[in-house]
């Protein structure tokens, strides 16, 4: 396995990679990590210009609510990048019910605190992004916490199916079974360092990665 470090991209791109008021990275940072992954995997990354930039407006994240000096923090702005092509997405809940949902949700008129829900509609046990223009393309699975939400849509340009699993919520099968059942070619882990260090998180990952 090969780790992909967002710091490798930050040496080249001097734009905002993390929100000021939130613990998440921006969609731009996720794109740069996607580019780094493609280089390692021997794939051609899609150009950012191929995506449609969407402005979801001002955003106040988790740091804002937890900071005693929150009034001094400047608002962030959430930008999202809609992938081109015939892209569909299905959300599967923990009770097995499934429904279609847009890859990017228009949260421009929603609460200033909810804008990160733009990406994949938030956190769900299983999300399947399908590029119907690549019927013979490979399949990948992204094991993630919420950091994976803005990252996964970019992969739709290189894979037929992108399966996105939130290991904190998914318990239908272990990774080894999932890889066999869905004919997975590549496995990616996208997670924040803070979550990776939590004991409960490691227990969940240990179970899922059997």
Listing of model-derived features with the role each one plays in the protein:
Residues 1-9, 13:
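Single conserved hydrophobic/aromatic residue that forms the stacking wall/gate
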Residues 2, 22-23:
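Alpha-helix N-cap/helix-initiation motif
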Residues 10-22:
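Lumenal/extracellular "mature" regions of secretory-pathway glycan-modifying transferases
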Residues 3, 18, 136-137:
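Alpha-helical hydrophobic/aromatic positions enriched in membrane-embedded helices and signal peptides
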Residues 23-139, 144-177, 181-185, 189-210:
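Extracellular/periplasmic envelope-modification machinery, especially enzymes
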């Amino acid at each position: 396995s090969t780790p992909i470090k967002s710091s490798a991209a930050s040496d080249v791109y001097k734009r905002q990679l993390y929100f000021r008021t939130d613990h998440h990275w921006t969609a731009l940072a996720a794109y740069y990590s996607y580019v780094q992954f493609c280089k390692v995997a021997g794939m051609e990354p899609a150009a950012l210009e191929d995506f449609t930039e969407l402005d979801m407006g001002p955003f106040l994240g988790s740091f804002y609510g937890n900071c005693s000096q929150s009034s001094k923090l400047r608002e962030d702005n959430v930008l999202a990048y809609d992938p081109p092509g015939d892209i569909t997405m299905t959300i599967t809940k923990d009770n097995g019910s499934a429904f279609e949902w847009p890859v990017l949700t228009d949260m421009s008129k929603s609460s200033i605190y909810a804008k990160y829900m733009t990406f994949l509609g938030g956190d769900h046990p299983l999300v399947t992004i399908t590029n119907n223009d690549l019927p013979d393309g490979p399949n990948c699975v992204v094991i993630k916490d919420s950091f994976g939400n803005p990252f996964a849509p970019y992969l739709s340009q290189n894979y037929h199916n992108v399966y996105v699993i939130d290991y904190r919520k998914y318990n239908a099968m272990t990774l080894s079974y999932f890889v066999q059942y869905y004919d997975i070619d590549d496995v990616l882990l996208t997670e924040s360092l803070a979550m990776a260090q939590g004991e409960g998180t490691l227990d969940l990952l240990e179970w899922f990665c059997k």
